[in-house]
């Protein structure tokens, strides 16, 4: 894939939770992240995320890597590892991104509301995009 067509592809950001999955998407230039939706974490969630990715021409997914204060994996990490494997089986490149305190950052920015998980996904994705600019 040439760099021009890769630039037009957006990247999806995911804040994976046991009850809800927050979804964000980058702009075409991969500079800014925007909250898109919050999906209930049901058996159909995988298909919903896949549809959002395809609708946004995203082949890459940045998935929040959930760890505790000591940096150890937690219950959510185990579930998100399974989600990662399932999305990779569908042909997506899935990249881990540390998500420590992303929900708290999102709440500070916008307050608590129905899109909080999507905003946390945008915080995760923006962190990844910012690091890619530095490289």
Region locations from a protein language model:
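Phosphate- and other anionic-substrate recognition elements at nucleic-acid/protein interfaces
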Residues: 2-12, 18-135
């Amino acid at each position: 894939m040439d760099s021009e067509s890769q630039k037009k592809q957006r990247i999806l950001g995911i804040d994976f939770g046991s009850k809800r999955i927050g979804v964000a998407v980058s702009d075409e230039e991969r500079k800014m992240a925007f909250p898109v939706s919050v999906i209930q974490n049901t058996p159909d969630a995988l298909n919903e995320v896949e549809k959002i990715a395809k609708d946004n021409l995203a082949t890459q997914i940045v998935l929040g890597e959930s760890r505790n204060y000591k940096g150890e994996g937690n219950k959510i990490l185990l579930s998100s590892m399974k989600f990662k494997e399932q999305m990779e089986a569908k042909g997506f490149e899935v990249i881990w991104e540390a998500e420590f305190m992303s929900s708290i950052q999102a709440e500070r920015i916008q307050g608590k509301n129905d899109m909080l998980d999507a905003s946390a996904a945008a915080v995760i994705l923006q962190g990844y995009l910012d690091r890619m600019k530095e490289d």
